[in-house]
Amino acid sequence: MSRLIVCLTVMVFVLVAPACTIPTGTNSVVDIPATSPAVATPDLLPADDPPAGDGVTVSPEPFPSARVPVSAPLAERISAAVATASAERGADMSIAVLDRATGSYLEGAAAEPVETASLAKLFVAAQMYHLDALGERPLSDFDNVLLKRMLESSDDDAANTLWDDLGGSDVVVDVAGRYGLAATTPPWDGLWWNTETTAADLVTFYAGLLDDRDGLGADRIAEFVGYLRSSTPEGIDGYDQRFGIPDGLPGENVVGVKQGWMCCVGDRWIHVSTGLIGEDNRYIVAVASREDIRYEDDEESYPDTAVTDVSEDSSARHARDTMTGFVKSLFPNGVVDDWAQPQG
């Protein structure tokens, strides 16, 4: 029976009011170690994993524990949650927060690189809408079907088709240039899921999209956001897409999300959760994680998550729970409003 070892880095981002410029280097909370080159594929799970409940040593108390002070300001909660996740879950985490209405911004290790996994599908969609707006490649009915499946259900086949049709890695170069994503780079191997970005760049991308930095027009932006708001509870591969933001913010009625997951990169699970919060998309949240996993017999393997169903894998579930618990510890009332204020 194969096993895997995994480690997790978490990035969280929240945004709020049109046409915001994200400050850099402010309110840094935690430094995250640099990531290693990606060696895996996205949005699927390991072969021959142990039965549910096996393998991962789980903290005797739920995450987050009482060591995360719910009444403290967000900056203090971030610091406590990062430390607690590392100690209790074997998880490294980073976060960036922006309120588009006020321009308030907070970050922790938001400049650390992370593989996008399925977050690269956002860049594919942005390129499709860009070319449609220019009239260079009008969207066909089939294109719209692929966009819907790719964004709502994280369909890898749809992403593969559009990625190849658009020229592969050129998509990342073009989108990064138009949106000012200074730390976002194309995949080293030409595979979209190995694109690298940062928490800060993901926040910048969403802010630029909502502010129409690329000249897409209101209708295209509304369609793009509509797909994110229609995200399915499970991906097309059966993987639970509610981790992180959706389950972590149960009090938010209007949430648009794009999720990503894959294993193994540097012997780690990668999970990414990003979202637009509120009817007016005032807030944008993004969370990325890397979590080390060790099964009880310590046997190591590197599952190909592009071809194997890991929806019931205990290590993946543990990492998802870490993501959700982290978000809950930052927003214990289950909503993002007044995030800079004590939430006791």
Task: Spell out what each predicted region is.
Residues S94-L98, F123, A286:
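Soluble periplasmic/extracytoplasmic beta-strand elements of cell-envelope proteins
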Residues V16-A19:
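C-terminal motif of bacterial Sec signal peptides marking the signal peptidase cleavage site
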Residues M1-V12, D143:
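N-terminal export and membrane-targeting signals
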Residues H130-R149, G168-S169, G217-R220:
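Short, well-structured active-site flanking segments
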Residues G25-P33, P37-M93, D164-G344:
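Penicillin-recognizing serine hydrolase domain
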Residues T21-P23:
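Bacterial signal peptide processing site
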Residues G103, P113-R137, M150, V285:
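Active-site SXXK
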Residues S86-P113:
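Short, conserved catalytic-motif segment at the N-terminal edge
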